[in-house]
Amino acid sequence: MGLPWYRVHTVVLNDPGRLLSVHIMHTALVSGWAGSMALYELAVFDPSDPVLDPMWRQGMFVIPFMTRLGITNSWGGWNITGGTITNPGLWSYEGVAAAHIVFSGLCFLAAIWHWVYWDLEIFCDERTGKPSLDLPKIFGIHLFLSGVACFGFGAFHVTGLYGPGIWVSDPYGLTGKVQPVNPAWGVEGFDPFVPGGIASHHIAAGTLGILAGLFHLSVRPPQRLYKGLRMGNIETVLSSSIAAVFFAAFVVAGTMWYGSATTPIELFGPTRYQWDQGYFQQEIYRRVSAGLAENQSVSEAWSKIPEKLAFYDYIGNNPAKGGLFRAGSMDNGDGIAVGWLGHPVFRNKEGRELFVRRMPTFFETFPVVLVDGDGIVRADVPFRRAESKYSVEQVGVTVEFYGGELNGVSYSDPATVKKYARRAQLGEIFELDRATLKSDGVFRSSPRGWFTFGHASFALLFFFGHIWHGSRTLFRDVFAGIDPDLDAQVEFGAFQKLGDPTTKRQAV
C-alpha cells in the first residue's frame, strides 16, 4: 500500500470490523503489560520492612495501585503491612496479575477473530449496503456502560457493600489499611483528602453517566449539530476521545503531585510540599511537646516518636530531589534505610539549643548554618576558615541524640559534630545501607514523581493531538480543497474520494 508510518491508521478509517479489532488488541497490550509488570515487581519486591523499606522506596509502580484498591495479600504468604498470612484468597497480588494476563490473552484472540471476520452484518447500513457506524448511538452505549461501572465502583467496591473498600490512612501516613468508606455527601466531600469523596463522587458521576447515556440512546442529535460537529466522522470520535484522556491525565498528574486521598503517602511516598512546609517536622515537635507536658523526659518523649513518622521527615524521600534522568528506585540512590539514629540536639557552650537550617528542595548543596530559637545565626561550618566567627570549634558546639539507636549518646568532637550537622540538613538522620544495591548516593525520585512526569508529558502531547485531529475533522472540506461556493450539497465524509460519481447531490 506504501503508506508513510504516520498515516497507517487510515486502513481502519472505513472498516468498522478492523477498527474494533485494533482497539481490542490495544486493550490486550495494556492489560498484558499491567499483569506482566505486576509479576516482575512481585519478583523483586522485598516485603520484610514496610516501615523503612516500603514499596515506594523500592520503586514499585503497579503494586501501589493494586494496594490502593484493596489488594494486600500475596500467594507468597506475606501481607503488605508486614504480617504473614495462611489464606491469601484468589484476589491476591498474583491473582490480579494472572487475571490481567488471562484477559490479555482472550483479547488477543478476540482481536485476531475480528480482524479475520471484519465484514459483519452488524456493521452494514441496511439503507446503503455499505459499512457504517451509528456513532451517536455508540456514544450513548459507552456512556451508559461507563456510568454503570463508575456507579458500581463507588456504591459497592469503595463502600465495602460488595468489595474490600480502599486504602485509608491518617494525615501522617501511619495507620493505613484497607477499609470500607462511607460516601461524604456534605461539603467535606469536596476536600481532596477526604476518602468519602471518592465514594460519593463515583456514585454521583456514575448516575450522571447513566442518565446521559440513556439520553443519547433515546434522542437523536439535530441535523445542524450533527453536521456542525461532524458527528458522522470517526476522526471526531478520535479527537474527543483524546480530549477526555488528556484532561484525565492532567487531573491525575495534579492529584499525584500535590497529594490527595487517592494517592496515600504510604503507597506512593510523601509529596515535596510536605518537606517544603515542614509538615512532618511540626507533627514530631508537637508530639514531643505533648510528651514533655506529661512530665516525660526529653529522651522518653523522642523515643515515643514512630520510626515511620521520623522517616517521612527525611529529604531523601522527597520526590522532587530525584533528577530527571536518574533511573532506578530511591533505594538505588541513597541506599536502603536500616534504622533511625535519633534526633540530634545541638548546643553551644552557653547551653543554648541550636537548630540546623534545613536544605530546600531544589538545592544540591547548602551551607551548614545553626540558628537559635529566634532565628539568629549562632554557628556554622565556614567556607573560608580564616574569616570564620561562628565555626563549630569557635562556638563550642556539641550534639546529643534523643530517641533512635544513639539515644543518650553525645559528641563534642568538632569533626563528629560537623558530620551530624551536615546530615541534620537533610532532616532526621538514618543509617543507610548503600552496599547491598551498590547505591551511588545520588537521590532518586519516587513513583509519585515518575507518575506525575509521565502523565503531565503525555497530557501535553495528547492536547496537541486533540487540536490536530479536531482541526482535521472540523475543516476537512477546507483541507481537501472543496470550493465553499459550490452550489451542490455534498455529503462529505461519507465517501473518501473527491469526485466520486456515487456521491449524493441535492440542489441547494
Swiss-Prot record:
Name of the gene? psbB
**Name of the featured protein:** Photosystem II CP47 reaction center protein
What Gene3D superfamilies does this protein's entry cite? Photosystem II CP47 reaction center protein
Judging by the UniProt lineage, the source's domain of life is Eukaryota
Note on how the cofactor is bound: Binds multiple chlorophylls. PSII binds additional chlorophylls, carotenoids and specific lipids.
| Organism listed in the record | Lobularia maritima
Its GO CC terms are:
chloroplast thylakoid membrane; photosystem II
- What are the GO MF terms of this UniProt record? chlorophyll binding; electron transporter, transferring electrons within the cyclic electron transport pathway of photosynthesis activity
Q: Report the membrane topology from the UniProt record.
A: Multi-pass membrane protein
- Functional note: One of the components of the core complex of photosystem II (PSII). It binds chlorophyll and helps catalyze the primary light-induced photochemical processes of PSII. PSII is a light-driven water:plastoquinone oxidoreductase, using light energy to abstract electrons from H(2)O, generating O(2) and a proton gradient subsequently used for ATP formation.
Q: Where are the transmembrane segments?
A: 21-36, 101-115, 140-156, 203-218, 237-252, 457-472
Q: What is its main location?
A: plastid
